[in-house]
Swiss-Prot record:
EC primary class: transferase
Protein name according to UniProt: Aspartate carbamoyltransferase catalytic subunit
Reaction(s) catalysed by this chain's protein: carbamoyl phosphate + L-aspartate = N-carbamoyl-L-aspartate + phosphate + H(+)
UniProt KW keywords: Pyrimidine biosynthesis, Transferase
Source species, domain of life: Bacteria
Entry's EC annotation: 2.1.3.2
Amino acid sequence: MLQGRNLIDPMDFSVEELEEVFSLADKIIENPKKYSKVCEGKLLATLFYEPSTRTRLSFEAAMLRLGGKVLGFSDANCSSVSKGESLEDTIKIVSGYTDVIAIRHPKEGAAEVASKHSYVPIINAGDGGHQHPTQTLTDLLTIRRIKGDFSNHTIGLCGDLKFGRTVHSLVKALSRYENNKFILISPKELKIPDYIKEFLNERNIEFKEVDKLEDVIGELDILYMTRVQKERFEDKEEYIRLKDTYVLDKEKMNVAKEDMMVLHPLPRVNEISTNVDDDKRACYFKQARFGMFVRMALIAKVLGVE
């Protein structure tokens, strides 16, 4: 039963509960009209303290397509935050007006703090470089619809694995399924955090760290590309030096498996060449579309209105 639940970390939902969300998302994809009024009279707040295109708009589109309404902000400077209002007070006020809150915040742990002060379910739409569980639901739904299941895959995660919250969440989620192996591809400056490696070691899950995509791309069933995130760097010269470390292009795709799938949480900068977009293995635009449907399912589940 997911009604009234928060989603702060991808591990907050059991495998069975995740399957409930994916099953409903599949039904919505097949017959969206059936669900077009289930959230009538309900309000979603989108509190975005950081910039967003896909996540914010897909949350808002999800609620509107369910028949609900949306309020919120996409620039904290246009709210009372600019006057010094605390996160805790903002949440107490907004949760009194609405039925569910999606929050993105630059500070790690902000969504957890919000959940302790809210009268309504909190959905973490990204907290700093920590977690991004609804992107993980999007990634998993895409894998499920294209690969059929979540087990027995070699998954390559490439790019900014240090600050890439989507990577951290996806590794944790896929570690719950059988016989998955991770290849972590990054420069030494952007290696995945130790706590994720400890998480994998504690569960005896196989992984290796490498710094060259071309050396391992032929092994992969799933390649998850990420951009190097300019906004996480204090040293802009280091960002410039690292930003084009990995570029997936046709030449590299020629070495990959015929059924490998390429995912990317978007936005991309230079890390996937546009000449890959027409490759049947490029799944990132489908992935973005599925994000709206999985958020529709999640909202319906936590509101108990399906």
